[in-house]
Amino acid sequence: MIKIGSHVRFRKPDYLFGAIQESLENKANAAMIFLGPPQSTFRVKPENYKLQDYQKHFFKQIPPEDIIVHAPYIINPASPIKAQFSNDFLVKEIEKINYIGAKFLVLHPGFFTSFTKEVAKKQLISSLKSILEKTKNVILLLETMSGKGSEMCANFEEIVEIVEAVESPRIGICLDTCHVWDAGYDLKNFPEFCKEIRRTRLINYLKVIHLNDSLSPLGSKKDRHANIGKGFIGLESLRKIIFDPLFANIPKILETPYVDNKPIYDQEIALLLKKV
């Protein structure tokens, strides 16, 4: 089954109900939300989410397991300085996700800044173990990154090493096509790309795909998303991810730029699903 959706707006007054309504208007059967501003840890109380309205009207069209939650960008679980704040926040975030009944929380692995990469890697593994010990049900998904600055997890071997070191069924990977392209993985050579995903065992942990084109050339380490078919990856390669059996049943989530201050996810979803 093809599962496809986009980042949708989780905002007052309708929050979850409004977000899933927007997804359905885009002809999607999956969705991704932030539970607050992406650059902030501010959160409203779960009783404001309009959960019952969602359950009454949209539960069957987009069930909770196909609602992906993304953690805010500002947390850094790989930092020995910021890990405690990040971990405490993520524990509370997972409690809110449990309230919704969603299954996956995507998070950026973090940066190594004033400390070594090895220190950051050990801290990240420790953080993930601590969060999982204090929570239930939700699966944490580390996102593949572009390698900008001192980002963690810009290559498949590293992200798989970290996931396997956590030793939990509640840890997995979210692959972002723009990020891995910018990190140097050539999606245009699709057979080789799939071979690399298998070789590194990343496929064993892959639970969600962020499907984005890239404004930047291969290996640029820029992390600049483009609309589908308007970047260097191209429509043909991204469409292969939709239809290839290797990625069947994995939710594909678009995070592409607005056009004229409006999302065009409905157009992009239709474009991707069109068989040529």
From Swiss-Prot:
Give the E.C. number(s): 3.1.21.2
What reactions does this protein catalyze?
Endonucleolytic cleavage to 5'-phosphooligonucleotide end-products
Quote the record's binding site residues for Zn(2+) 1. Answer: 70, 108, 143
Keyword annotations for this protein? DNA damage, DNA repair, Endonuclease, Hydrolase, Metal-binding, Nuclease, Zinc
Q: Which cofactor(s) are needed, names only? A: Zn(2+)
Citing just one GO molecular function, the answer is: DNA-(apurinic or apyrimidinic site) endonuclease activity
Return the broad EC class: hydrolase
**One of the protein's GO biological processes:** base-excision repair
Q: How is the cofactor bound?
A: Binds 3 Zn(2+) ions.
Q: Where does Zn(2+) 2 bind?
A: 143, 176, 210, 255
Checking SUPFAM superfamilies in the record gives: Xylose isomerase-like
Quote the Pfam families the UniProt record gives: AP_endonuc_2
Q: Where does Zn(2+) 3 bind?
A: 179, 223, 225
Q: Which HAMAP family match?
A: Nfo
Q: Which PANTHER family match?
A: APURINIC-APYRIMIDINIC ENDONUCLEASE (PTHR21445:SF0), ENDONUCLEASE IV ENDODEOXYRIBONUCLEASE IV (PTHR21445)
Please report which protein family the annotation says this sequence is part of: Belongs to the AP endonuclease 2 family.
Q: What does this protein do?
A: Endonuclease IV plays a role in DNA repair. It cleaves phosphodiester bonds at apurinic or apyrimidinic (AP) sites, generating a 3'-hydroxyl group and a 5'-terminal sugar phosphate.
Q: What is this protein called?
A: Probable endonuclease 4
Q: Which organism is it from?
A: Mesomycoplasma hyopneumoniae (strain 232)
